[in-house]
Structure formats: C-alpha cells, structure tokens
Amino acid sequence: MYYLKNTNFWMFGFFFFFYFFIMGAYFPFFPIWLHEVNHISKGDTGIIFACISLFSLLFQPIFGLLSDKLGLRKHLLWVITGMLVMFAPFFIYVFGPLLQVNILLGSIVGGIYLGFIYNAGAPAIEAYIEKASRRSNFEFGRARMFGCVGWALCASIAGIMFTINNQFVFWLGSGCAVILALLLLFSKTDVPSSAKVADAVGANNSAFSLKLALELFKQPKLWLISLYVVGVSCTYDVFDQQFANFFTSFFATGEQGTRVFGYVTTMGELLNASIMFFAPLIVNRIGGKNALLLAGTIMSVRIIGSHSHTALEVVILKTLHMFEIPFLIVGCFKYITSQFEVRFSATIYLVCFCFFKQLAMIFMSVLAGKMYESIGFQGAYLVLGIIRVSFTLISVFTLSGPGPFSLLRRRESVAL
C-alpha cells in the first residue's frame, strides 16, 4: 500500500521502464543489425564493441564523480535523455552510413554515442535512482524491476518490427525518449529533508570530496571487487555481445531466428522482472557478497552450457538470464553500501562495476571476435566459461563480508 502512494517510486519505475525499453530496441538486436543489415564481419564487430568499450572508459569515471558531486540534481540525466531523443536519426543517418564508408571512423563515432548513452549512461541512471530510492524510502530493486518489463516488451515488439523494417525500431526508441523527458520533468527529488537523510544518500555537495574519492583507490577491497567484475561480469558481457548471432544460427532462416530470439528474450525478461521483485528480500537475507557469488555461478552455468548443439538447449540457457541479472545488480549496490561509504556509491559503481569492466572488454572483445572465427562460438564459450568459473571461485575468498561458509554456519547454529 505504501508503494501505491510513493510518487517517486512510480516516476523512477517508469523511467526505468522506458529507458530499458529503448535499450531493448538496441542491445539484443545490435549484433544482428551489424551483421544482416550492414554486413559487418565478426572480426569488425569485435572492433566496434571494442570502440564502444574504449569511449565508455572515458565517460564512466567522469559520470561516477559527477553523479556523487551532483547528488540528486538531474543535470546529467537531462543530457542523457536529450541524446536518446536522437536515437533514430543517429542510427539511420549517421552510424549506418559511416560503417559503410569507413569501419574505423564508424566505430569511433558509434563508440562515442553508445558509450555515452548506454555503457556510461545506464549505470549513471541506476546510481542516481539508487540514491533517490534511499531518499524516498523505496527498494531500488523493485523500481529496477520496471526496467526488466520494459526490456521484455520491447524485445518482443522489436523482434517483429525488425524483420519488417529495422528503422521502425529506432524511431520507437526516439519516441520513448520523449516520454523519459516528461517523467524526468515531473519527478521530485529536491524536497526538504533532514541533513541526516541527505548525507545518507550523498545529496549534500559538502559530503563529497574529490580528494576523498581518490583515497578509495588505496583500499584493497576496492581492487578485489574490481577483480570480481573483470573476471566474472566482464566475461559474461563479452559472451553476450554476439550471442544473438549464435542463437539465430540454430534456425532455418535469419528472420525466423530473430523472431524466436525476440520471444525468448521477452519471456526471460518478464521472468527476470518477477525475480527482481523478490531479489531485495533475498539479498538482504544472504548479503551482497553471496548475491554476487550466486550471480557468478549462474552465469558460469549459462556460458559453459552454451557449448550445446540444439535450439532447445540454447533457448533454455537463454532463460537463465532471469536469475543472474537481479542478483548481480541488487547485490552490487548492497555490497557497495555495506562495504564503502554511501556518499561515494556512484563513483564506486561506475569505476569498479563499469570502468574496469569496460577496460577489460577492450581486449576481451577483440580476443573473443578472433576466437569466434577460429574455433567457433561453442569453443569460445567453453573458454569464457572456464575463465568465469575460476574467478567466481577466487572471489569466495577475496570479497569482503560474510560468505557462503558464514551462511552455512549461521544455518547450522539456528538448527541447533
């Protein structure tokens, strides 16, 4: 009943919905758009993704520091929203034609735009709304659930629209960006509050200091969580980059594969949303560290399992996505707020969970692209899966806070 009356919960919930609706028009079908519409090779696709990662590196630490400096002011979100309105014109009239003229130039321009609005923009939005959730007393994970639903609905719609005319998908994204602007306009985060609450969310500018933020890098636990991100989260993102092309290869035609991919993505994201609703309760019970380890375990199963040979197996493995993302996202913020000062939450999130991941992806994307061409998707996925399992096991001992062994001991003591 409380959530029904919490205006900011609905405003930011629907902001997540439409933002990830736009992302759903881009991310799942981007490899297909590159390969089937623009006839880009697997190797060149790796270069494009590497450029996106490169420019994301420039924006993510800046966005992190800027987000903590701005607190709950919406300046950065306005810039991201304005660029999203240009989603369709950019893809249709700028990015696509440039890729045909010069692959490197197109990759650089695309990397700047996509790195800004998605790879750096998405975590900046998540970090902002996580701060707003603490100010407005609602669970971040439940607001983030709207994003899963938005992605799911768009994936199904875009899967159909893409096979009719791929440009329809991009115009749909630009239209949704206009709705984002309206939601941002009417959301209210600057209401009067006590200094205690403002400090808790890092809303006071005096609570933020660049010098203190840089002091974070002297803490070993920051580097250890970064090790988890590079070895676990980064490996998964590299795996997912060209998974759509691997998925469609199991079907008679590319159009059939694209449609089925859209349906499966929709089903997975709707299930993802249902898990996301309960994720805060589970993560609060098991702790941030265990949530991250659980996400790593599920992702490892999916990657290694993709060394499969039938469409049914690939469909089943695709739906595992519904479990991994809720525990990764909610778990990472739980870990950050329990192990570090909350006034630096955005900086830590965008540097550790985003910047270091993108840094590793510059090299891993190119390496994965070469593996896809030399040993095929299945062989490459087996290699990525082994890397993932190794780093998940290492993280059991390197991440701070109560781990799985502490959880087992606690259960045994309760049983006694």
Curated annotation (Swiss-Prot):
It catalyses: lactose(in) + H(+)(in) = lactose(out) + H(+)(out). The record marks R302, H321, E324 as: Proton translocation. The record marks E126, R144 as: Substrate binding. The record marks E269 as: Substrate binding and proton translocation. Residues 1-13, 67-75, 119-144, 188-211, 284-290, 337-347, 400-416 are cytoplasmic. GO terms for molecular function: lactose binding; lactose:proton symporter activity. Belongs to the major facilitator superfamily. Oligosaccharide:H(+) symporter (OHS) (TC 2.A.1.5) family. PANTHER family: 3-PHENYLPROPIONIC ACID TRANSPORTER-RELATED, BLL5896 PROTEIN. This is Lactose permease.
